[in-house]
Amino acid sequence: VNFFKGLSADELQARRAAAELAIKEMGISFTVYTEGENIDRAWPFDMIPRVISAREWSGVSQGLAQRTRALNCFIDDIYNQQKILADGIVPADIVLGSDNYKAQCEGASPRFGAWAHICGSDLVRDHRGRFFVLEDNLRVPSGVSYMVENREITKRAVPELFRNYSILPVDDYPLKLYEMLAALSPRAAKRPNVVVLTPGIYNSAYFEHAFLAQGM
């Protein structure tokens, strides 16, 4: 905050312009679906980052990992022993009557018990600084590519932040994603092929599909 307070209005505008130029050069966009047409828009970028301390992030990251494990245990139970249904914790009719429930998966047991390999949890922070999860996106979570590219743009616009402060990296996400997916391969290949399936260039998340495929 003190760093940005020390910048003049002209300096802030110049850095904002540099960030917008970087977004155009990097081709960062998303598709807005409107009636009758699809519109590609440049990614909106806030140059002032939301700061989370290492201590806070340690608690948040551990909580999210625990939450993802719990969600996988829930899915595994639903398709196997169904104890959570028998105990009445979750109404059976809601689960078994859902269009998303796949009876073909009953009795299945994926490697490492990983039904949901990626979880996109939407976090909010209240006025007391407490974090809450709004929802968990397990089927086709998207948005991580914008996080990685936001960091790259921030490095270009305000490189001083990365010289003067210890900031955790995020650019290794595609590699970690590949390693996780490769570990799930049923084949004993040294470097299994991992692909990203995409509906195509007109899909709203196509930028991310291409970004992750190239990064892996």
Residue ranges and their predicted role:
Residues 1-216:
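Preference for protein termini
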